[in-house]
Amino acid sequence: MTINYPVGTHHGKTLKNNTLRTGKTTKKVLFGKRGMGLEDEINLANDYYLANRLAVVHKKPTPITIVKVDYPARSAAKITEAYFKQASTTDYNGVYQGKYIDFDAKETKNKTSFPLKNFHEHQISHLASILSQGGIGFVIIKFTSLNENYVYPASELIQQWQHLNGKQSISYQEIVDKSFVVPESLNPSLDYLTAVDKMLEALH
């Protein structure tokens, strides 16, 4: 499927049993799997948080306008061309401990820095707006080559963006110094709320 971007937008608590109750049956739910992408791990973590009543966080849908659809069969339809209605902001939002949270997820294979080109100006503006309203904003950054995950506060990202004029890169050491490491966990495999808790403690 061809996707066309709009012009100018290139750039807590735990329960004893991790179960999900559905109707008359009770299912054991596992929320960890190694070797998957960052977004997949976040999605599984969000499922775990929801099942255990820790937080309600969802991936934001991306609105598109369909231009062309093929019908290879009467019972099937395949979108072959579409474009985004508007520039996307961040990947996830929800509610945690009575607070609105909003964050993005980024990966890099670079071992020494994180390129700011991974962000767009409208995303930085969006995170600034979240902070101005008392919300919680951050970025989950994964250094894939190092298998390290960090919760990087939006306030630090905004400061670096302004300092570097949205160009160049944030050094790995800067991110390590100003971020909160996401500890390795079995279930979920990416327990990012543990790092968010530490971030909130430090900010207050």
Swiss-Prot record:
GO molecular function: endonuclease activity; magnesium ion binding; nucleic acid binding
GO annotation, biological process: chromosome segregation; DNA recombination; DNA repair
One cellular component (GO) term of this entry: cytoplasm
InterPro entries registered for this protein in UniProt: Resolv_RecU, Restrct_endonuc-II-like, tRNA_endonuc-like_dom_sf
Main location: cytoplasm
Family under the similarity heading: Belongs to the RecU family.
Function: Endonuclease that resolves Holliday junction intermediates in genetic recombination. Cleaves mobile four-strand junctions by introducing symmetrical nicks in paired strands. Promotes annealing of linear ssDNA with homologous dsDNA. Required for DNA repair, homologous recombination and chromosome segregation.
Protein name per Swiss-Prot or TrEMBL: Holliday junction resolvase RecU
